[in-house]
């Protein structure tokens, strides 16, 4: 369940509405003739709204389903039941081709800046991959876009030729942010984006996210367990328990 802290954030229209969202993971026994003997209730009947241009903080204890909720919104996993309405479209009901097109509108910044980047790819290829997948830019245009994104997140264009292991944790998270921005999304799920970073670096990344939100008119769902961080960045807070 969630409890939303009410706070005035203006009269912005709703971009995302989650209604009665449920995700149960089945527990099975047996190998050849397996059968379901129970279920883990990862997300159990949650509802909330997110308005355009705001940051909704999503907090709760470990294991309460925060990260699962983020992945359900992006349809990285399928819900058991419930509605996820993004800009008037019910995500669980969309066919695959429409969902693929909609993915440009919604991106995610992962918690682990070390594990979320392919160590065999250069930074330029990592950031440019979404542009290739969604056929947004190729060749010289793609390289130009990658350079622009690197500079936007506080890195340099020459970093495009380097590999992830050559960067610090904070720099890697900036690369992850640049990758999320590549397709010009409207909604970004920030899945504990600073929890793996040193305290001295956390503030820099938070400030960067706030600056990018203003520059690109972004909407965030900021998932975290640190209430101080959530209070600093969020317009409203939803508590999962």
Q: Where is each model-derived feature located?
A:
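Conserved ABC ATPase "signature" region
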Residues: 90, 141-158
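Conserved ABC transporter NBD signature motif
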Residues: 82-90
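A short, proline-enriched helix->beta-strand linker immediately N-terminal to the Walker B motif
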Residues: 182-186, 202
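Conserved signature/switch motifs of ABC ATPase nucleotide-binding domains
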Residues: 165, 183, 207
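ABC ATPase NBD coupling module
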Residues: 32-36, 91-107, 133, 139-140
């Amino acid at each position: 369940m969630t409890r939303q802290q009410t706070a005035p954030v203006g009269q912005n229209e709703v971009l995302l509405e989650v209604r009665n969202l449920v995700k149960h993971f089945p527990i099975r026994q047996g190998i050849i003739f397996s059968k379901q003997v129970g279920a883990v209730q990862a997300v159990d009947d949650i509802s909330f709204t997110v308005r355009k241009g705001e940051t909704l903080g999503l907090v709760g204890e470990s294991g309460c389903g925060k990260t699962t909720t983020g992945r359900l919104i992006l349809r990285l996993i399928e819900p058991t039941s419930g509605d996820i309405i993004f800009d008037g479209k019910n995500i669980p009901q969309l066919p695959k081709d429409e969902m693929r097109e909609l993915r440009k509108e919604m991106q995610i910044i992962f918690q682990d800046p070390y594990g979320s980047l392919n160590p065999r790819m250069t930074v330029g290829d990592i950031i440019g991959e979404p542009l290739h997948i969604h056929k947004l830019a190729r060749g010289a245009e793609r390289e130009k876009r990658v350079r622009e994104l690197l500079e936007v997140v506080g890195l340099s264009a020459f970093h495009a030729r380097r590999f992830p292991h050559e960067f610090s944790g904070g720099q890697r998270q900036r690369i992850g942010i640049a990758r999320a921005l590549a397709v010009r999304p409207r909604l970004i799920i920030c899945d504990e984006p600073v929890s793996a970073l040193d305290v001295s670096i956390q503030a820099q990344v938070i400030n960067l996210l706030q600056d990018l939100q203003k520059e690109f008119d972004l909407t965030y769902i900021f998932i975290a367990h640190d209430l101080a961080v959530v209070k600093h960045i969020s317009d409203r807070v939803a508590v999962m328990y």
